[in-house]
């Protein structure tokens, strides 16, 4: 199972789909970053 863009993610249980970056704020709330392909 993988996390979609802007959804919560955590490794290794739930990485982001399509190799998106999982960005965490203060090491707690992690969400998948959008890629250029998601924006356009």
Swiss-Prot record:
Disulfide bonds join 2-17, 9-22, 16-32, 24-30. Expressed by the venom gland. GO terms for molecular function: ion channel inhibitor activity; toxin activity. It is found in: Secreted. Signal peptide: none annotated. InterPro entries: Spidertoxin. Gene3D superfamilies: 4.10.40.10. Keywords: Disulfide bond, Knottin, Neurotoxin, Secreted, Toxin. It comes from the Eukaryota. GO terms for cellular component: extracellular region. Pfam families: Toxin_9 (PF02819). Neurotoxin. Belongs to the neurotoxin 02 (plectoxin) family. 01 (Tx3) subfamily. The presence of a 'disulfide through disulfide knot' structurally defines this protein as a knottin. This is U2-ctenitoxin-Pr1a.
């Amino acid at each position: 199972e993988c996390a979609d863009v802007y959804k919560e993610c955590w490794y290794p249980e739930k990485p982001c789909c399509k190799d998106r970056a999982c960005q965490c704020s203060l090491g707690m709330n992690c969400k998948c970053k959008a890629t250029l392909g998601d924006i356009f």
